[in-house]
Regions:
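Membrane-helix entry/capping segments
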Residues: 3-4, 11, 252-296, 318, ...
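C-terminal membrane-exit region of the final transmembrane helix in multipass inner-membrane proteins
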Residues: 5, 25, 392-432
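Intracellular coupling helices
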Residues: 6-18, 306-347, 417-431
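Hydrophobic alpha-helical transmembrane segments of multi-pass inner-membrane transport and secretion
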Residues: 15-44, 284-321, 349-354, 405-406
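Transmembrane alpha-helical interface segments in multi-pass membrane proteins
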Residues: 18-29, 321-367, 398, 402-406, ...
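Membrane-proximal extracellular/periplasmic loop immediately following the first transmembrane helix
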Residues: 37-108, 115, 223-226, 373-384
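Short acidic/polar micro-motifs at solvent-exposed secondary-structure junctions
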Residues: 62-78, 96-127, 140-154, 192-193, ...
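Mid-to-C-terminal secondary-structure elements
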Residues: 127-141, 152-282
């Protein structure tokens, strides 16, 4: 039966090449557009190295503090200070790992007596390397002991290593200048795409090796600063337990702050919520976000479905007599309707394959523009999109589901009308 549907679909392609080609290309462009929208969100949430554990990550990228002497709506918002990060999150018993790291910054690197170059930097602790799966091609990450001691060690990417030394191998142990201070290279990792929103940098150093945790980088008595926290859960089912422990830690921390107190604004966030958490003082409305996504997909599906439905209706006009003959020889209305929908599904799936290929090519070639957001404007490198970030099994599932939905929307009504017409009208070539 399925083989027969394929034959019938190919026969239509030969008999009505222009109409069928327009229909297939229209469907392909629709699927392409929908999949680009899906990938724009997917690339923010789907795991890929070095953020392969995204489905187990919780984030606290900013928070708020207020004071009993301030007005009711008065608050200071932004990243936290180191004392807050340690007081509220370090050593969580319900989590597998907790890492404290800084907001992205630019550091100047150079060889002694060399030309300085600005690159993207993160300052982290040792747990950072156990949460994210970087690919080391030389050396190793710096350890907890090195962070505790404040040693000037660094991990750099292979492109930075080639820029400085002309090679990315046998670089560990050598010295470079980082903001005019001498650092020893601990390891070299493969380049990281800037789409890895938490792990991305070109150089990583211990936050204890600089002065970033104090001085002008903190305010509100050290409560606020430039630190962030990422939490690795043993399982996503532990998220609520982790949030509950974070809340207990917050209350205990507040008890020692005097007139100050901190609050999380709904955090820790999972990966999806974090991607929508744009402002430090506003908790994202995820219900509104999901409604917006549903409306977008309905528009993207319904508008082309109406056009494709009229094309399906035009193709059926040329098959009215055939439908009448089938009905006169005992074919049921359900059988006629099912065959029309199935034949149209074959064409829709063909178009879906073409549309998915279009989408992958467009995303790979122009992904830096399609998937860029305001965060990337402040980085020193352009966004890099890799096949492994786009080529996911879930991508095929989404494409298949949209093909099925588009097929039902575009062929359901014409098929129903064709199955309901009288045998006499069908044999006389009338499609009312």
């Amino acid at each position: 039966m399925i083989k027969q549907y394929f034959k019938q679909a190919l026969a239509q392609l030969r008999q009505q090449p222009l109409l069928t080609t327009i229909s297939v290309l229209g469907t392909a462009l629709t699927i392409c557009l929908i999949m680009v929208v899906v990938m724009q969100q997917q690339i923010k949430t789907t795991p890929f190295a070095p953020e392969s554990n995204r489905n187990r990550l919780l984030h606290v990228k900013q928070m708020s503090t207020s004071n009993k002497n301030w007005s009711d709506d008065g608050s200071s918002n932004g990243p936290m200070g180191l004392q807050t990060a340690k007081g509220c999150f370090e050593g969580l018993t319900t989590a597998e790992e907790v890492s404290i790291y800084t907001i992205p910054e630019t550091m100047q690197v150079a060889l002694p007596r060399g030309v300085r170059t600005g690159i993207d930097a993160l300052e982290t602790d040792g747990a950072f390397w156990r949460i994210f799966d970087f690919s080391f091609i030389d050396g190793k990450p710096y350890s907890d002991a090195e962070v505790k001691s404040g040693l000037p060690v660094a991990v750099i990417t292979e492109s930075v290593a080639r820029l400085l030394f002309g090679t990315s191998h046998q670089v560990s142990g050598k010295e470079i200048l980082v903001n005019d201070a001498v650092y020893r290279i601990s390891g070299v990792v493969k380049d990281v795409s800037s789409m890895a929103s938490t792990a991305y940098a070109q150089i990583w150093v211990p936050y204890s090796s600089t002065h970033i945790t104090g001085g002008d980088n903190t305010w509100c008595d050290g409560i606020m600063g430039v630190m962030r926290v990422v939490i690795l859960a043993r399982s996503s089912s532990d998220f609520e337990a982790i949030r509950a422990e974070c809340e207990r830690r917050r209350l205990a921390y507040n008890s020692g702050l005097g007139d100050y107190f901190v609050f999380y604004r709904g955090q820790p966030d999972d990966q999806l919520t974090m991607s929508q958490h744009k402002w430090a003082n506003v908790q994202p409305d995820m219900a509104a976000y999901f409604r917006q996504q549903v409306i977008i997909f309905l528009i993207l599906l319904l508008v082309p479905a109406i056009n494709l439905s009229s094309m399906t209706h035009s193709r059926l006009r040329q098959r009215v007599a055939e439908i009448g003959v089938r009905r006169s020889f005992g074919a049921t209305r359900g059988g006629v309707m099912g065959q029309i929908v199935a034949e149209n599904l074959v064409l829709t799936l063909m178009a879906g394959v073409v549309g998915l290929l279009f989408c992958l090519i467009i995303s790979y070639c122009w992904g830096g523009t399609l998937f860029a957001d305001s965060r990337l404007m402040y980085l020193n490198t352009a966004p890099v999109i890799e096949w492994k970030m786009l080529f996911k099994f879930s991508t095929f599932i989404y494409a298949l589901l949209f093909c099925l939905a588009l097929n039902l929307l575009s062929s359901g009504w014409p098929a129903w009308r064709a199955s309901r017409m009288s045998i006499i009208n069908a044999l006389s070539g009338k499609l009312n």
